[in-house]
């Protein structure tokens, strides 16, 4: 349960970082640029013109989910402007319980 909560907190923090990126640059990073765009200035289009030289994460690294897997970032998203996903303990799409996906569009109970 604690790992699920940690993933939810991480996703909320990543969302905040993405929103700060958009406030500075007028757009979100593309799927191809990925979350790495929050710590390293992208060199592919669209190149951000007002990228924060300190990046958008306090620790200057993209967090992994509590199971050691990278968060999935899609922009444009299927469920919103962007989608953030942890595939849970099994690192596979779908599942139930601790294997359930944790996302930025569904509230976990």
Enumerate the predicted regions with their spans.
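Short, surface-exposed interaction loops/tails
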Residues: 4-5, 16-19, 24-25, 32, ...
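Acidic, glycine-rich loop-and-strand cores that form catalytic or ligand-binding grooves
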Residues: 34-55
């Amino acid at each position: 349960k604690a790992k699920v909560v940690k993933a939810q907190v991480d996703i909320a923090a990543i969302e905040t970082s993405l929103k700060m990126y958009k406030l500075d640059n007028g757009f979100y990073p593309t799927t191809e640029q990925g979350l790495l765009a929050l710590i390293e200035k992208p060199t592919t289009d669209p190149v951000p013109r007002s990228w924060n030289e300190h990046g958008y994460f306090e620790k200057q690294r993209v967090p992994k989910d509590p199971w050691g897997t990278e968060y999935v970032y899609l922009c444009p998203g299927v469920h919103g402007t962007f989608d953030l996903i942890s595939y849970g303990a099994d690192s596979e799409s779908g599942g139930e319980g601790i294997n359930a996906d944790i996302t930025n569009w569904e509230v976990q109970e």
